[in-house]
Structure formats: C-alpha cells, structure tokens
C-alpha cells in the first residue's frame, strides 16, 4: 500500500482535473513495481494537503491511517488483469476489456 500526501485538495485529483486521477498518477508504481514483484496491491492511503488543513483534519488523517493499518488484511485490493489476458506483445488481447481508466483499450 502506498501512503502519500499531496500538496493540493482531493478535488484536483479527479480524471478531468489538473493533477489527474490519483490512480493514474500512481499506476507506474502500483503496476510496474508492486504488482510486478508479486504483491497484492492495496488501495492507496492519501492525505490531501495536510500542511493546509487544520489540526482536527490532520488528526483525522492520522486516525484513518491507523485504522487502515490495523485492518490492512481487509483493505480493498486494486484489480489487475491476469497475465493470460495479454498477448506476446504485452497488450490486452482482442476482446479483453480494460477495467480501469489507466489501462485503456486502444
């Protein structure tokens, strides 16, 4: 699981916003490093702009992170297509539909 902070609000990490979807931003690490090395990839924990929010929000981030760590075995896993869904060229086989905004059919 990636745990990260951002310098901007959660609103800027939507697919049509300036920073783009957070899953797109993290895709190279999730897919190219963690999944490739055999890890189950857990939904990331993101604390948005902790330096610009009040102490009560920062405390909530810490509490939420603590809860996530204590219950990590039940944390949602990200979906990745199995290897057999890819051809020799490492592209999705014809008829296999991409399931994420990062993994697109072209």
Residue map of PLM features:
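Short glycine-rich His-centered loop
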Residues: 6-10
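Glycine-rich phosphate/pyrophosphate-binding loop and the adjoining helix
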Residues: 11-106
């Amino acid at each position: 699981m990636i745990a990260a902070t951002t310098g901007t609000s959660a609103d800027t990490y939507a697919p049509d916003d300036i920073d783009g979807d957070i899953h797109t931003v993290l895709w190279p690490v999730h897919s190219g490093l963690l999944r490739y090395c055999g890890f189950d990839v857990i939904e990331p924990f993101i604390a948005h702009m902790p330096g610009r929010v009040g102490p009560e929000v920062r405390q909530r981030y810490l509490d939420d992170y603590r809860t996530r760590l204590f219950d990590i075995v039940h944390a949602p896993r990200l979906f990745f297509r199995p290897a057999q869904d890819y051809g020799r060229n490492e592209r999705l086989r014809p008829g296999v539909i991409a399931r994420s905004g990062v993994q697109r059919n072209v």
